[in-house]
Regions:
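Short glycine/acidic-enriched loop and turn motifs that connect beta-strands
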Residues: 58-64, 128-130, 171-175, 226-231, ...
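Blade-edge motifs of beta-propeller repeat domains
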Residues: 2-38, 75-105, 133-154, 180-203, ...
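A detector of repeated loop/turn-to-beta-strand junctions in beta-rich toroidal repeat architectures
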Residues: 66-70, 83, 121, 128-130, ...
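Hydrophobic strand positions within the blades of repeat-based beta-sheet folds
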Residues: 53-55, 71-74, 89, 106, ...
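Beta-propeller blade termini
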Residues: 36-50, 107-116, 150-160, 205-213, ...
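Beta-propeller domains
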Residues: 200-210, 214-366, 373
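Acidic/hydrophobic-patterned starts of short beta strands in beta-sheet-rich repeat architectures
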Residues: 47-57, 116-125, 160-169, 215-224, ...
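Beta-strand-rich domains and repeat architectures in extracellular enzymes and scaffolds
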Residues: 35-74, 105-108
Length: 473
């Protein structure tokens, strides 16, 4: 059971021509982003059957070059993820195009089996240069890499032909557009491009995410929008793929809810064949906050269905004021700054994990924490919600001001009905050096006993203020 989160599309922007001469395109049907059910293929770079994890360190130093950026890959095995099993890839790594450069911020990620060989690949950005495809293989990532000649970082099979496509945002014109790069060649070339959506000149495209919400074998697009002249505008819209285009489908809300300015995470909460949409929103300081029922942030689940959203179950905001949820709904808590979905107790339903990086613990301002909402057939409620922080028994470390524990969360899936592992980052740990904590799942959810933490030092480098763990995938 996998999760993915809509991040801003600023990670990768490259302008491209309308067509390109391509190398032979990859063929086959095993494309990671092509959904057969709500369960997305594992992120498994070496094909051993165990989920891997990456930490993208955009501000990492490489050979003395500041903010060159690197990706740390943590390989999974039968015991889960271990900090000891890692691989570091940067632009000085043999076979990776280019070379490490100051402020290039190599990283970001879009994992998918782009060449349909059964190994997960990784699409990364490299500053002002072209994106790079790191191909997976028996030895993992890094044995083969090419420059990607298209644009974007939302990888999916939008045409339903078994081939990976990449969606990107092109804001070079007055009216922005979303462009699909198709028929990707083994050398990173793009056989053809087409404009999938065009903005109206008022709306701006800010982020993209691919997922097969209606489970028809074609990936759909979740599009995050803003407005050119109005800060209190924007939200997330769902566009269902028809194979040759996209049809906008409204996301229905319940009375009193407000999904504008919300972030969205995709994952299976209720255990059926359709991915669900987990919305999180924090107060913005704008007029729309009047309609938003929270001081510190909220989470709502819109269940998926054959038409995109199962409208028979309307989403409801859950806050720290909801019965059963630990803590209090307070200004600055930043509930929902991060979110992930995964089956942490092995019952077939996905738990919803949301970060509370602004939570004050005692006198430690912004020490942070995470909330774990139990997944059910109807979604989530406040009942049986757990909170985890550095003051929780058996969790390494102590609550300190500015740790921002919960600034990023990620779920590493296990085998079917085997509890997944929860990864939580505290990007502000040790004066912004950052760190990551791993909590194994159990029949009662994530457990703190035996949990471990690690940071940049585990990679054999001198830690610096890189906010390690700020980007997990």
């Amino acid at each position: 059971m996998k999760t993915s989160r809509l991040r801003t599309a600023s990670a990768i922007f490259v302008t491209l021509a309308a067509t390109a001469t391509a190398a032979p395109a990859f063929s086959g049907t095993a494309v990671a982003a092509a959904q057969a059910s709500a369960v997305r293929q594992q992120v498994d770079f070496n094909g051993d059957g165990y989920e891997d994890m990456i930490a993208s360190v955009l501000d990492g130093t490489v050979s003395g070059i500041k903010k060159a950026g690197y990706v740390a890959v943590y390989r999974g095995d039968a015991k889960g993820i271990s900090p000891a099993r890692h691989q570091v890839i940067n632009q000085n790594t043999a076979g990776v195009p280019g070379s490490a450069a100051a402020n290039a911020r190599f990283g970001g990620s879009a994992p998918a089996d782009i060449d349909a060989d059964g190994y997960t690949d990784l699409l990364v950005s490299a500053g002002n240069g072209r994106p790079i495809i790191l191909f997976g293989g028996k030895s993992g990532l890094g044995t083969r890499a090419v420059e990607f000649q298209g644009q974007g970082n939302a990888v999916g099979d939008f045409g339903g032909d078994g081939r990976a496509d990449v969606a990107g945002i092109d804001n070079t014109e007055w009216a922005g557009r979303i462009v699909l790069s198709e028929n990707i060649g083994a050398d990173g070339s793009v056989g053809s491009t087409r404009t999938a959506l065009t903005a109206d000149g008022v709306t701006t495209y800010e982020g993209l995410q691919a997922a097969d919400i209606n489970n028809d074998g074609k990936d759909d697009l979740l599009v995050r929008t803003g407005c050119n002249d109005e800060p209190d505008c924007g939200g997330t819209s769902l566009y269902l793929s028809t194979g040759t285009g996209f049809t906008r489908t409204d996301i229905v809300t319940a009375p009193g809810t407000y999904l504008n300015h919300a972030s969205v995470t995709v994952g299976s909460v209720n255990g059926d064949a359709y991915p669900d949409l987990v919305f999180t929103r924090r107060p913005t300081g704008l007029d729309s906050d009047v309609d938003f029922p929270s001081k510190g942030g909220a989470v709502a689940v819109a269940l998926g269905g054959p038409k995109g959203q199962n409208t028979s179950v309307k989403p409801k905001w859950i806050t720290q004021a909801t019965a059963g949820v630990p803590g209090a709904d307070e200004k600055g808590d930043a509930l929902g700054a991060s979110a992930a979905v995964g089956d942490l107790d092995g019952d077939g339903y996905g738990e919803v994990v949301v970060g509370l990086p602004g939570e004050d613990v005692g006198t430690a301002k912004d020490a942070g924490g995470v909330l774990v909402f139990k997944g059910r057939a109807s979604g989530i409620t406040g009942a049986d919600t757990k909170v985890i922080g550095q003051s929780t028994v058996d969790v390494p470390g102590v609550d300190e001001q500015g740790d921002a524990f919960g600034g990023e969360v990620h779920v590493v899936s296990g085998a079917k009905n085997v509890p997944a592992t929860l990864a939580v980052a505290a990007p502000g740990e040790n004066t912004n050096q950052g760190g990551v904590w791993l909590f194994k799942g159990s029949r009662t959810g994530p457990v703190t006993k035996g949990s471990v933490s690690f940071g940049e030092a585990s990679l054999g480098v001198t830690p610096s203020a890189v906010r390690f763990g700020n980007w997990l995938g």
